[in-house]
Amino acid sequence: MASTRARPMLPLLLVLVAVVIPGPVGAQVSIHPTEAFLPRGGSVQVNCSSSCEDENLGLGLETNWMKDELSSGHNWKLFKLSDIGEDSRPLCFENCGTTQSSASATITVYSFPERVELDPLPAWQQVGKNLILRCLVEGGAPRTQLSVVLLRGNETLSRQAVDGDPKEITFTVLASRGDHGANFSCFTELDLRPQGLSLFKNVSEVRQLRTFDLPTRVLKLDTPDLLEVGTQQKFLCSLEGLFPASEAQIYLEMGGQMLTLESTNSRDFVSATASVEVTEKLDRTLQLRCVLELADQTLEMEKTLRIYNFSAPILTLSQPEVSEGDQVTVKCEAHGGAQVVLLNSTSPRPPTSQGTSPRPPTSQIQFTLNASPEDHKRRFFCSAALEVDGKSLFKNQTLELHVLYGPHLDKKDCLGNWTWQEGSQQTLTCQPQGNPAPNLTCSRKADGVPLPIGMVKSVKREMNGTYKCRAFSSRGSITRDVHLTVLYHDQNTWVIIVGVLVLIIAGFVIVASIYTYYRQRKIRIYKLQKAQEEALKLKVQAPPP
């Protein structure tokens, strides 16, 4: 039979008729199945049957969907409903005589969501700010058995029922550093297990979040304000505490020109270092600019640099090496706008001309002196100052004067009178002064034996005597007598002392022995006398016979 599609209003009219007009006694219409669960666009066979025995029985099926009558009998008909798009209630009706009756079935349609989509995430999300996640669900039935889940990686953030079409669910996340690189997604769950089917999932596209953090927004630009021509300067720009440092871009510009640099990125630190040779070609004033880019943020720091040229002062000696008594001129000159502010020396002896007392700054200072031995290795110091951009800069120069003079052998150089104990360890110091350094010889005047200069491990009495020391160099010579006295004790004296001590001790022993002998003898005599006296008393007291 040809497929037909019922008119929309007819089922409603039939229901009303069935309610208002009761059927004949015993007549009943039935529909099978009374409930059906099928996918959207599916088909189902519906059987309408009646208990009416009237030969003119009219039996039919009303539905919104395409139907085909597959077969029929006197009181039944079998239909096929196709392309069912949504939940519906097909109606079997009968005309039995002058009455009508009907029965309906429930068809529930299930379908998977047509669209499950997580809204695109921002290119960068700042740490500490709220991120709103949105998941859109279109389609899917039955809605009572449909839910949507938001995920961060494998962690469930939110689970909500889907009660509208389309349905948008949201969830707010406080972004953290740990969310950098995290994957976010959403999926739907259509639970058809109560109907004997499975749990079906539809997953959205996974989106990755990138977070950033800039707790400190001030770049650190480490560089001097003043740059001297002829020097190699290092510029350093850095920022600490940012995240992720590996994604940060940092660069340096000087005078609008990008500098070649070395950059360092660690866990939460980024830096850029550039080395620049300062030349005369550079402008006297330049802008140094550091730029850091992270996410959609840009940080900048600028510094004004001043270029200057400042050469060290020129310090000269009329002669760097002179003889004792010669006159020496010391001169210090500054150039390029610099001023000499100090010309001095390490020696406390003042110069013989023009002095070094404070004076107003000038481009040149000089003085003269008559060289003496005290001026040997005297260091002269010159300081020049240049004011640049309100700051005073200084450069210094030093020179050393060498004075040639003959040997000196004073008490401070060679004590000349030593008294040592025989057998002791001593150090004999005798060092003449002079330039060039003089040689020294010391020998005993009596026999020419040399004086032991330096470490003496054991002093001997044979070293005792007067020595003549001679210091000499190409500048002359000088002599001086020195004395070494060795204290010692004669062995014969010790023998006599020991003998006397032995005699004294022997005499003391003899006297003590004699004293002890006579004392014991006297005690014995005393005891004997006492015994005799006692015996006599006893004899006198005895009665006569």
Swiss-Prot record:
Topology with respect to the bilayer: Single-pass type I membrane protein
Assembly mode: Homodimer. Interacts with MUC1 and promotes cell aggregation in epithelial cells. Interacts with ARHGEF26/SGEF. Interacts (on T cell side) with CD81, CD247 and CD9 at immunological synapses between antigen-presenting cells and T cells.
Region of interest: Disordered: 343-365
Motif Cell attachment site, chain ranges: 177-179
Domain Ig-like C2-type: start-end pairs: 41-103, 128-193, 230-297, 325-389, 423-476
Organism name: Rattus norvegicus
Entry's family note: Belongs to the immunoglobulin superfamily. ICAM family.
Residues in compartment: Extracellular: 28-492
Cytoplasmic topological segments: 518-545
UniProt-listed PANTHER family: INTERCELLULAR ADHESION MOLECULE, INTERCELLULAR ADHESION MOLECULE 1
One of the protein's GO biological processes: T cell antigen processing and presentation
Post-translational modification: Monoubiquitinated, which is promoted by MARCH9 and leads to endocytosis.
Keyword Ubl conjugation in annotation: yes
Main location per the UniProt record: membrane
UniProt feature coiled coil, ranges: none
Gene from which this protein is expressed: Icam1
Superkingdom as given in the UniProt entry: Eukaryota
Protein's cellular compartments: Membrane
Residue ranges of the TM segments: 493-517
An annotated Gene Ontology molecular function: integrin binding
GO cellular component assignments: cell surface; external side of plasma membrane; extracellular exosome; extracellular space; immunological synapse; membrane raft; plasma membrane
Protein name: Intercellular adhesion molecule 1
